């Protein structure tokens, strides 16, 4: 009996070793994307997996010295950190100056194309630094990796996986108009009720909005096929056979989508798409002593948390003074993450910080509102803790994210370009004083928390699943094996139309033949 128990114990320990000792290689994207995926990597390490990150020699947030729990393979690149900052500043300026409207849409997408061309150049350097570097590739080949975790915003992660002969998993929020998910992942997206990502539309669209939605999808498809299509020749060269970017991306085993139904509008998905939105969220921890003392001085009015994220460093003096003037007029105390010059209009109720523990502040019982730029990470922390928002979106997905929160009744938006002190003040008073905003924020929070598995656990499970089973091919839809005309059943429709046309033609011929026969018979009788 004891022998059997020991054998069973050894068997389970062996299984545990198989599950818990994976070797993961990571192809990341810098910026806020890294801040999100790092939480997932920390959890993988906690579960006894080895994690190696392929990081370029110049980055914004990926720091091998600070993240000692992770192994880093440095990729030599010739661009500098200032080049990355320049691209980000260009992106912010593009959205602020030409935020997509019917009048600015063409200019916006033209400039976006130029920006993508610049991004292509820097991204390609990272690709070459690995794929065309025999020394790095040899080390990776000897690494014994089980799976590659990639953010598809930065190209070539899938190429590294294929060259190493291992499966790969994606982690992403979305691509513009879901181009990658639709064309490469094959998810259906009925344009009648699925708003294109970045369109700032909801699933309740008027006729005019549906027209805008179709235009948004069409423009993003054009950009994807034109600018991102430049990768096709590169991918074909690396793999040594004709292929496309999309065909290669379509080989992803699992797509970990950093969203959930507390954030998204209902729409169809596929079985290899898993929702892990808010995986970085966690219960609030105690605040630093000095910060807690300031929070407690707010009394019954509570506090407002204000952050424009990690990518926006400074504002113009005029804009900073405008904001500070509005904040000075509310009874709440304000904790503002800001590194710029101290505004002349800064009120006694407002304190500036180079950095704030945002999640811990949003989880504080005295927090009444969150002024946010609309980044996904910050919005999910607000959802997690049930805090209503004032959105001041600036670029990329931020306007679209705030549009989602407005539609769900948990946010008010203020336009960064045109806002006045009164606009910001009125928006703050609205979300703080009107109970519906807090109620809707709490409703989203309850939806987020009421899941059978926590988002972080779900993400780890599917990465481990791919390692255990060497992939997840059983979840891959047959759409990947169809041509575009087969996918839309155009061949079948054409065949059926041909059959109908043939039948109509045959009936017409028969009728004509009968009429001719009847006519000849009638003429013959008359002659007789």
Curated annotation (Swiss-Prot):
Family as reported in the entry's similarity comment: Belongs to the UDP-glycosyltransferase family.
Q: What is its EC number?
A: 2.4.1.17
Stretches of the chain found on the membrane's Extracellular side:
22-494
Annotated catalysed reactions: glucuronate acceptor + UDP-alpha-D-glucuronate = acceptor beta-D-glucuronoside + UDP + H(+); 17alpha-estradiol + UDP-alpha-D-glucuronate = 17alpha-estradiol 3-O-(beta-D-glucuronate) + UDP + H(+); 17beta-estradiol + UDP-alpha-D-glucuronate = 17beta-estradiol 3-O-(beta-D-glucuronate) + UDP + H(+); chenodeoxycholate + UDP-alpha-D-glucuronate = chenodeoxycholoyl-24-O-(beta-D-glucuronate) + UDP
Per the UniProt entry, the signal peptide is 1-21
Q: What is the annotated role of this protein in its UniProt record?
A: UDP-glucuronosyltransferase (UGT) that catalyzes phase II biotransformation reactions in which lipophilic substrates are conjugated with glucuronic acid to increase the metabolite's water solubility, thereby facilitating excretion into either the urine or bile. Essential for the elimination and detoxification of drugs, xenobiotics and endogenous compounds. Catalyzes the glucuronidation of endogenous estrogen hormone estradiol. Contributes to bile acid (BA) detoxification by catalyzing the glucuronidation of BA substrates, which are natural detergents for dietary lipids absorption.
GO terms assigned for molecular function: glucuronosyltransferase activity
Keyword Lipid metabolism assigned: yes
Question: Could you tell me the keywords of this UniProt record?
Answer: Glycoprotein, Glycosyltransferase, Lipid metabolism, Membrane, Signal, Transferase, Transmembrane, Transmembrane helix
Cystine links in this protein are: none
Q: What is this protein called?
A: UDP-glucuronosyltransferase 2A2
What more is known?
Answer: UGT2A2 isoform is part of the UGT2A complex locus which displays alternative use of promoters and exons. The locus is defined by 2 alternative promoters resulting in 2 functionally active polypeptides UGT2A1 and UGT2A2. Alternative splicing of exons results in additional isoforms for each protein class.
Q: Where in the cell is it found?
A: Membrane
Residues on Cytoplasmic side:
516-528
Q: Is the keyword Chaperone assigned to this protein?
A: no
- Membrane-topology descriptor: Single-pass type I membrane protein
């Amino acid at each position: 009996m004891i022998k059997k128990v020991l054998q069973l114990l050894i068997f389970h320990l062996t299984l545990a070793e198989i599950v818990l000792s994976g070797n993961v290689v990571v192809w990341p994207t810098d910026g806020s994307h890294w801040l999100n995926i790092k939480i997932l990597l920390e959890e993988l390490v906690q579960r006894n997996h080895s994690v190696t990150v392929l990081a370029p020699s110049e980055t914004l947030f990926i720091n091998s010295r600070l993240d000692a729990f992770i192994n880093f393979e440095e990729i030599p690149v010739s661009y500098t950190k200032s080049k990355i900052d320049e691209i980000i500043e260009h992106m912010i300026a593009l959205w602020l100056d030409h935020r997509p409207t019917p009048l600015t849409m063409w200019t916006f997408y033209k400039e976006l194309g130029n920006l993508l061309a610049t991004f292509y150049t820097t991204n390609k350097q990272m690709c070459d630094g690995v794929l065309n570097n025999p020394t790095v590739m040899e080390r990776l080949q000897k690494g014994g990796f089980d799976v590659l975790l990639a953010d598809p915003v930065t190209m070539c992660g899938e190429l590294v996986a294929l060259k190493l002969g291992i499966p790969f998993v994606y982690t992403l929020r979305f691509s513009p108009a879901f181009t990658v998910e639709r064309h490469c992942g094959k998810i259906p997206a009925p344009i009648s009720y699925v708003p294109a990502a970045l369109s700032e539309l909801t699933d309740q669209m008027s006729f005019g909005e549906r027209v805008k939605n179709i235009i948004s999808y069409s423009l993003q498809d054009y950009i994807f096929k034109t600018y991102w299509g430049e990768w096709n020749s590169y991918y074909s060269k690396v793999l040594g056979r004709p292929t496309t970017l999309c065909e290669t991306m379509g080989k992803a085993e699992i797509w970990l989508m950093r969203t959930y139904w507390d954030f998204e509008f209902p729409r169809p998905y596929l079985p290899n798409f898993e929702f892990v939105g808010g995986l970085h969220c966690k219960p609030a921890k105690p605040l630093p002593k000095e910060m807690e003392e300031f929070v407690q001085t707010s009394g019954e009015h509570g506090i407002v948390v204000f952050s424009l994220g990690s990518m926006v460093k400074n504002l113009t003096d005029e804009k900073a003074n405008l904001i500070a003037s509005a904040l000075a007029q509310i009874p709440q105390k304000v904790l503002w993450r800001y590194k710029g010059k101290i505004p002349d209009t800064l009120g006694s109720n407002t304190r500036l910080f180079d950095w704030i523990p945002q999640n811990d502040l949003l989880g504080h019982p005295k927090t009444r509102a969150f002024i946010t730029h609309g980044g996904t990470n910050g919005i999910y922390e607000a959802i997690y803790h049930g805090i209503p928002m004032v959105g001041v979106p600036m670029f990329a997905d931020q306007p679209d994210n705030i549009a989602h929160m407005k539609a769900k009744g948990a946010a008010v938006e203020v336009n960064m370009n045109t806002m006045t002190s009164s606009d910001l003040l009125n928006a703050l008073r609205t979300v703080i004083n009107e109970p519906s905003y807090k109620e809707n924020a709490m409703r989203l929070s309850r939806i987020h928390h009421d899941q059978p598995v926590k988002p972080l656990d779900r993400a780890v499970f599917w990465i481990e699943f791919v390692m255990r089973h060497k992939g997840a091919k059983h979840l891959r839809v047959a759409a990947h094996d169809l041509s575009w005309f087969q996918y839309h059943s155009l061949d079948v429709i054409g065949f059926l139309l041909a059959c109908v046309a043939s039948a109509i033609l045959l009936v017409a011929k028969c009728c004509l033949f009968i009429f001719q026969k009847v006519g000849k018979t009638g003429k013959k009788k008359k002659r007789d």
